[in-house]
Amino acid sequence: MAVQQNKKSPSKRGMHRSHDFLRTTPLSVDPGTGEVHLRHHISPNGYYRGKKVIKTKED
């Protein structure tokens, strides 16, 4: 089993753990339709930045 050579101080321990938190997914609302989608992704109805970019089954 590995044994530490030097004790990690509380400050260094905190710095090590500083990135362990969970991040929320960045959501955006399409201004034209009001659909919620991931930022920089096409909304479920085929719109990106207010323009229709792909055809969907409903079209």
Swiss-Prot record:
InterPro entries per the UniProt record, alphabetical: Ribosomal_bL32, Ribosomal_bL32_bact, Ribosomal_zn-bd
GO molecular function, one term: structural constituent of ribosome
Biological-process GO terms, alphabetical: translation
Region Disordered: start-end pairs: 1-40
This protein's UniProt keywords: Ribonucleoprotein, Ribosomal protein
Xref: SUPFAM superfamilies: Zn-binding ribosomal proteins
Keyword DNA damage applies: no
GO cellular component, one term: large ribosomal subunit
Domain of life: Bacteria
Family note: Belongs to the bacterial ribosomal protein bL32 family.
PANTHER family: 50S RIBOSOMAL PROTEIN L32, LARGE RIBOSOMAL SUBUNIT PROTEIN BL32
Name the record gives this protein: Large ribosomal subunit protein bL32
Lineage: Bacteria, Pseudomonadati, Pseudomonadota, Betaproteobacteria, Nitrosomonadales
Gene that encodes it: rpmF
